[in-house]
Amino acid sequence: NDSFHDLGKEIWAERTHKLIGEAERFVHYIKPDDLHRLNLDGMGHNLAQGNLVIVDLGSLTHMPSQQEVCRRRIQTLAQQTGLPVFALNEADTLLMIAGRNMRVDTEKHKLGVAQWSQLSDD
């Protein structure tokens, strides 16, 4: 009897699939295309389904006016869905909109990083 199991074998994938089932929520990572535009088509529906949207504007750091246009589009999407936008970095180039029924801890986290003094030992 071998004490190690190859978790890549199909039998383990089948067992895991039976226990867990299909994912109901998804993460959508969006960044500007080659023409520096954001394709946000259908994202309002995805947010209403409870999906998470992360927008990376880091490729536009040399284009502040285009970055601002994209930020306004993200803000409009957030207003239409009634959800807040969170900046995940100090440069405000990594933005997040948490979908319906998602909770974001704004007390123990600053810019997406837990502050060690506020974490409990439980």
Where are these regions (language model features)?
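Helix-rich interaction surfaces within compact, conserved domain-sized segments
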Residues: 2-11, 77-122
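N-terminal start-of-chain detector that recognizes signal peptides
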Residues: 2, 24-27, 57-58, 66-70
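N-terminal intrinsically disordered, cationic/polar leader segments
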Residues: 1-42, 46-49
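Short glycine-rich, basic-tinged beta-strand/loop micro-motifs
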Residues: 47-61
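Structured extramembrane domains adjacent to transmembrane segments
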Residues: 36-44, 57, 94-99
